[in-house]
């Protein structure tokens, strides 16, 4: 019997060093990849994050695994810092835990998601999103 989604989320987060929106900005300045898994509709409603690479959740592991033939060029090694974001910071925790299971030990997510970013008063991008198929 499944322990439920809340237990799954708690387990996923227990292995993450989650970042605040301001810590995320600092991590990206230091070279971390900022990965946005939101849908096009949600990005249209909330706006895009500066410097984020948009990757659909259904192909996230394939695009970020350095050993995958379908990886993005920025997926340069298992030691690369990756910060995953979603709308509110729930599915991003599950995604980051999956990336850690894959061997990307520095994968994490941002507390509060894009809504947390907006609440923190951080700027949204003025440029089109960097969407990776």
Go through each PLM region and give its residues.
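Short, surface-exposed ligand- or partner-binding patches at beta-edge/loop junctions that are enriched
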Residues: 85
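Rhodanese-like catalytic fold shared by cysteine-dependent sulfurtransferases
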Residues: 1-33, 40-81, 90-133
């Amino acid at each position: 019997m499944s322990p439920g989604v809340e237990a799954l989320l708690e387990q996923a987060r227990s292995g993450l060093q989650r970042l605040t929106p301001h810590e995320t900005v600092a991590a990206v300045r230091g070279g971390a990849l900022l990965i946005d898994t939101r849908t096009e509709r949600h990005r249209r409603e909330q706006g895009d994050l500066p410097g984020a690479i948009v990757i659909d959740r259904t192909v996230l592991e394939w695009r970020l695994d350095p050993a995958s033939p379908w990886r993005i060029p920025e997926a340069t090694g298992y030691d690369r810092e990756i910060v995953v974001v979603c709308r509110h910071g729930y599915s991003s925790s599950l995604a980051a835990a999956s990336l850690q299971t894959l061997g990307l030990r520095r994968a994490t997510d941002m507390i509060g998601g894009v809504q947390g970013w907006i609440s923190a008063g951080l700027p949204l991008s003025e440029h089109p999103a960097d969407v990776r198929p």
